[in-house]
Swiss-Prot record:
It is an enzyme of class 6 (ligase). Beta-alanine binds at residue 49. Catalyzes the condensation of pantoate with beta-alanine in an ATP-dependent reaction via a pantoyl-adenylate intermediate. The lineage of its organism: Bacteria, Bacillati, Chloroflexota, Dehalococcoidia, Dehalococcoidales. The gene is panC. This is Pantothenate synthetase.
């Protein structure tokens, strides 16, 4: 792939994925192509970002389907390495993020962002993109990768695009395929809780305790939902907000049966 990069004329746009693509991924590809970049999509289910009791083995995979979608989307190149290629025997060098990983997903999934940063740093090194595209749904991941690129002087612009949702508001996720019909219906409560926060802020409610409580109560009304966290965080630091403002982002995570989903929304 590094040899191939030297043969590509012009800057590269990278869309890193774990496969089982959906419209959210395709929106990232369209953003890259709109900027006249040679667009590379990577497909790699990264084992090092999964915990020992998480869903690495059952994570949905369908390479034939993904390749057809990428071809239809006009992707110029696909990088789909094996685990052995990315982590050869004896591999023992890691990118460890700092304080941005300590809350939210990092607290619930220890070691997750070390795996994410390591694999993304390797992708940046292999593919040498001018721009890399990530979705807002994984907002903490986006901030951490952007910080990593800046701290390590990686010559890549890390871009974020808005969450793509189903018509009823459910954020698109490859893991949605795990949901039963009743769990999928229940999962809409995450979106409703975020709308509750946004509505309260629009009505000039700036007390984070009140907004968090209302969000939590909304989710708790759904019997199939098991809350991991409800947060009102600073958009830049991810510190919990003392007062809600235009710089606040609401983030939620919950489990529906065996499926864990996350979502977020800017309040302004």
């Amino acid at each position: 792939m590094q040899k191939l990069h030297r043969e590509i004329c012009g800057p590269v746009g990278l869309v890193p994925t774990m496969g089982y693509l959906h419209e959210g991924h395709l929106s990232l590809i369209r953003a890259s192509k709109k900027q006249d970049l040679n667009t590379v999509a990577s497909i790699f289910v990264n084992p090092t970002q999964f915990g020992p009791h998480e869903d690495f083995k059952k994570y949905p995979r369908d390479e034939k389907r993904d390749m057809a979608m990428l071809e239809n989307a006009g992707v110029d190149y696909v990088f789909a390495p094996s685990v052995e290629e990315m982590y050869p025997p004896g591999f023992d060098s890691w990118v460890e993020p700092g304080v941005l990983q300590e809350r939210l997903e990092g607290a619930v999934r220890p070691g997750h962002f070390r795996g994410v940063c390591t694999v993304v740093a390797k992708l940046f090194t292999i593919i040498c993109p001018a721009k890399a595209y990530f979705g807002q749904k994984d907002y903490q991941q986006y901030l951490i990768i952007k910080k990593m690129a800046s701290d390590l002087n990686l010559d890549v612009s890390v871009e974020m695009l808005p969450i793509v949702r189903e018509s009823d508001g459910l954020a698109l996720s490859s893991r949605n395929t795990y949901l039963s019909a009743s769990e999928r219906k229940a999962a809409l409560v995450l979106y409703r809780s975020l709308l509750t926060a946004k509505s309260l802020f629009a009505a000039k409610e700036y007390n984070p305790e009140i907004i968090r409580r209302k969000m939590t109560e909304e989710i708790q009304r759904e019997s199939l939902a098991e809350i991991d966290y409800v947060s009102l965080s600073d958009q830049d630091t991810l510190g919990e907000a003392d007062k809600v403002s235009i710089k606040t982002i609401a983030l939620v995570a919950a489990r529906f049966g065996k499926t864990r989903l996350i979502d977020n929304m800017f309040l302004a």
